Amino acid sequence: MYHGMNPSNGDGFLEQQQQQQPQSPQRLLAVILWFQLALCFGPAQLTGGFDDLQACADPGIPENGFRTPSGGVFFEGSVARFHCQDGFKLKGATKRLCLKHFNGTLGWIPSDSSICVQEDCRIPQIEDAEIHNKTYRHGEKLIITCHEGFKIRYPDLHNMVSLCRDDGTWNNLPICQGCLRPLASSNGYVNISEFQTSFPVGTVIYYRCFPGFKLDGSAYLECLHNLIWSSSPPRCLALEVCPLPPMVSHGDFVCHPRPCERYNHGTVVEFYCDPGYSLTSDYKYITCQYGEWFPSYQVYCIKSEQTWPSTHETLLTTWKIVAFTATSVLLVLLLVILARMFQTKFKAHFPPRGPPRSSSSDPDFVVVDGVPVMLPSYDEAVSGGLSALGPGYMASVGQGCPLPVDDQSPPAYPGSGDTDTGPGESETCDSVSGSPELLQSLYSPPRCQESTHPASDNPDTIASTAEEVASTSPGVDIADEIPLMEEDP
């Protein structure tokens, strides 16, 4: 009838034909069975034998669904299974079993019939959105709210509603959309995740290029409220790379910034020479500008006339000089202090001796056993000595030889009867006046007045007189020859 075509479910005529087709063989089988029984038991039992056969009643087919098997006689042990069409779900048991009850009759277990009810629409999975209701039935509208920075967009711009269909599906399902992922340059990178496809309003991204490439365009892009970027994505253009810098004999170069894998635009090279060599020019830098080195000149290192010590050696030499100078100064100060201490101790044991002071008013003293002893001045010593000699002696002071005036005694040695002074007497006078031993006799203990005795009686009279003359002579420094204290014998 349908010429090999599969009719749709729910066709009443087809279901009726399906129910009638399986029943004919079963009835034919029942008739054959009845005739066999009639042959065995006789014609008297033909009527009651067919009526004794028992079967379960037809369980029926649920609306908007179907059953397997769809028709026939359900004897004891038969099973009926139930299914629903799309958009519906089964409410009840999926299968029923024909069994005999305790009273001996047959029935379906479970006894409740299964039905097909309309299915609810499932909650859709929408990224960057929040769905308010948890269940939606046929004909209900979908209610969602997009996250901050995202806006709702429908496939059908003329229909801004999404409804739940009777088959449990949604029509015109919306999405929450932001700015779409911008293109990235193959020679650069952007600060976004590779899995992120949509960006909320206000998002700012930036682009960077790999070394050797220059950014052409805006480095920063912002997602605007109309869900487009503030500008087109930039490009990374290749820069012209400078060749290898010129080589320097007895030197080398370093580049800034380091390391220099490629001499890109803006790279700076600094030249330097080996120890003992120096650059011929004060300028030691060249810069890569659009594939060329600027300034373009050859760098040379020449041998230095004077080799300057290294910084370490210079510091070491400086510290040596400072240490030597400080040590010398400390040593000189120590020697000065020791000399001063020695001079102080020497003066305490040996008072200084020198010419008499010009001023007679300044007193001199020495310290003897911790007790200061006043010394006579030069004038006092001279006046005291002259007063002790007497008036007769003063007349002969101006002459070269001091002789007593009152006493004209003969000489102390025989054969000398001449009263005149000879050459020998003059020499004796000079030797006596210059002898330092005569000065010591001035401070010897006083003796008895022997001036009245004649000079011839005592040979020491001449020496004593000479001593007195020497004490009055201005050419003799009495103060230097006077002992400060008497030494023990």
UniProtKB/Swiss-Prot annotation:
Coiled coil: none
Comp. bias (Polar residues): 449-474
Biological processes annotated in GO: negative regulation of complement activation, alternative pathway; negative regulation of complement activation, classical pathway
Statement: the UniProt record of this protein carries the keyword Repeat: yes
Acidic residues bias (residue ranges): 478-489
The Sushi domain, residue ranges: 54-118, 119-178, 177-238, 240-303
Segments on the Extracellular side according to the record's topology features: 41-318
Residue ranges, annotated region (Disordered): 1-20, 400-489
One Gene Ontology term, aspect cellular component: membrane
Membrane topology reported for the UniProt record: Single-pass type I membrane protein
InterPro entries found in the cross-reference section: SUSD4, Sushi/SCR/CCP_sf, Sushi_SCR_CCP_dom
Signal peptide: 1-40
Annotated compartments: Membrane
Transmembrane segments: 319-339
Disulfide bond positions: 56-98, 84-116, 121-164, 146-176, 179-223, 209-236, 242-288, 273-301
Cytoplasmic side: 340-489
Its job: Acts as a complement inhibitor by disrupting the formation of the classical C3 convertase. Isoform 3 inhibits the classical complement pathway, while membrane-bound isoform 1 inhibits deposition of C3b via both the classical and alternative complement pathways.
Glycosylation sites: 103, 133, 191
Species annotation: Pongo abelii (Sumatran orangutan)
Keywords carried by this UniProt record: Disulfide bond, Glycoprotein, Membrane, Repeat, Signal, Sushi, Transmembrane, Transmembrane helix
Listed name of the protein: Sushi domain-containing protein 4
